[in-house]
């Protein structure tokens, strides 16, 4: 909407701007995000939470926590900060595989370490965890790097890249590439980009544009602008339906976000965690019918450079399945209370045939499977990083970019109903709430 109204028209006054923000959801987002302030070792002056919540059918942003205090930090964490995607990028390989006729019941070797074509350094799962042949459902639930690099080798990295862009990851995202390890998320999107891309999945393959201005009227009530956007089909319904068992496995059982299913038992839940290998960032993008929410966490020093999220809450390591999931639950549990239905209405039966049976891997040392919350990490070759961006390693390695200098815009909210002050860093009414709520759930390794 900002491009349709110049400064002269805005300064003349008389415009009535309505945002998409739902006051109750905004309050819930602030309470959930600022619950991190109660966690031992968490310092909101350097450690940041970004949360965006969207209606996947319309693209309307329902809530946005973009920083603790805009007067102290003039940076929108949702639309300007960037953080390494890590394993939150893996679903795009599942989509690429589905486009080629594959199924999430295809099997691959989960052996760790593994060497792949053109690589002098092996790919590893977190902590040296090694598995036998597993389906992509289990590999997604456990976030196995070796399996997903093997999958990416089969589907070809450029197809994973295309799936990500089609879903909603901008083509100019820092670190986005068509190399074999792109599946491990060396790219650094904005929080809102992940919300948008996962909304495409949650909407059965139709992509919508994220927006925070619902409508603009003049002083006489004449409609000057409407944020309504027509969805664009980028994946077939059957393709998206076919990958859902893998994404649903993440949020239950032994998945890296297993607490989600029991917390929101009334609705079908799905999503993916993501963590950088040096704990420079951690995030969880999860969705239910009618709502998608991404939670990103990262840390910067006084110079704006990314530094590890360590010494937080007594944990040795910081994963997407830890506090990002907790904050997601703290927000989504009340926010979804009035959503209708229990499953995604667009889902169809998928009768795909398994077309890949992995060879039996050579014997290797196998250790106990990771517990819920932990997810595998791996170190690929570094990617080039602009000097203006702080560097950050993906969950799987690579020098990417976190935090402070993303190339996004400020979502230019200007809305008149932004609820309470999550300090969205937008131009709108941040009605400064006094929120310190949000209880932090039990810790998981």
Model feature map: region roles:
Residues 1-18, 31, 41-47:
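Non-catalytic structural connector segments
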Residues 19-42, 51-53, 64, 70-84, ...:
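A penicillin-recognizing enzyme superfamily signal
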Residues 43-47, 108, 175-177, 262:
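Short, glycine-/polar-rich solvent-exposed loops and beta-turns at beta-strand/coil boundaries
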Residues 102-160, 207, 219-249:
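Conserved catalytic neighborhood of penicillin-recognizing serine enzymes
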Residues 120-128, 156-196:
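Mid-domain, small-residue-enriched loop/turn segments at the edges of structured enzyme/sensor domains
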Residues 346-445:
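Proline/serine/threonine-rich low-complexity "mucin-like" segments in extracytoplasmic/periplasmic regions
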């Amino acid at each position: 909407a900002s491009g349709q109204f110049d400064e002269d028209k805005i300064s003349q006054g008389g415009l009535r701007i309505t945002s998409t923000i739902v006051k109750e959801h905004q309050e819930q987002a602030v309470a959930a995000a600022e619950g991190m302030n109660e966690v031992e070792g968490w310092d909101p002056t350097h450690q940041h939470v970004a949360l965006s919540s969207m209606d996947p059918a319309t693209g309307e942003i329902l809530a946005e926590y973009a920083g603790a205090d805009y007067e102290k930090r003039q940076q929108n964490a949702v639309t300007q900060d960037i953080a390494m995607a890590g394993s939150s990028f893996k679903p795009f390989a599942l989509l690429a595989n589905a486009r080629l006729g594959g199924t999430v019941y295809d099997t691959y070797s989960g052996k760790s370490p593994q060497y792949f074509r053109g690589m002098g350094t092996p790919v590893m799962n977190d902590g040296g965890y090694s598995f036998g042949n597993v389906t992509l459902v289990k590999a997604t639930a456990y976030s196995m790097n070796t399996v997903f690099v093997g999958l990416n080798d089969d589907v070809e990295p450029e197809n994973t890249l295309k799936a990500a862009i089609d879903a909603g990851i901008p083509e100019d995202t820092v670190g986005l590439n068509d190399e074999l390890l792109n599946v491990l998320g060396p790219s650094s999107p904005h929080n809102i980009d992940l919300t948008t891309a996962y909304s495409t999945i949650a909407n059965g393959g139709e992509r919508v544009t994220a927006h925070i201005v619902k409508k603009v009227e003049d002083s006489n009530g004449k409609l000057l602008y409407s944020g309504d956007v027509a969805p664009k089909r980028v994946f077939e319904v059957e393709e998206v339906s076919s990958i859902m068992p893998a994404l649903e496995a993440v949020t239950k059982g032994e998945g890296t976000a297993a607490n989600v299913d029991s917390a929101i038992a009334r609705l079908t839940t799905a999503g993916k965690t993501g963590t950088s290998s040096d704990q420079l960032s951690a995030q969880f993008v999860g969705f239910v019918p009618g709502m998608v929410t991404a939670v990103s966490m990262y840390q910067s020093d006084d110079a704006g450079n990314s530094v590890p999220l360590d010494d937080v809450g007594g944990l040795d390591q910081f994963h997407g399945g830890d506090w990002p999931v907790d904050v997601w639950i703290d927000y989504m549990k009340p926010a979804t209370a009035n959503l209708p239905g229990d499953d995604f209405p667009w889902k169809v039966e998928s009768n795909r045939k398994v077309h890949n049976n992995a060879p039996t891997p050579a014997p290797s040392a196998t250790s106990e499977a990771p517990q819920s919350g932990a997810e595998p990490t791996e170190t690929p070759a570094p990617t080039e990083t602009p000097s203006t961006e702080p560097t950050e390693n993906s969950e799987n390695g690579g020098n990417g970019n976190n935090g402070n200098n993303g190339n996004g815009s400020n979502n230019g909210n200007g809305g008149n109903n932004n609820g309470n002050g999550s300090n969205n860093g937008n131009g709108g009414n941040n009605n400064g709430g006094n929120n310190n709520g949000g209880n932090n759930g039990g810790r998981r390794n």
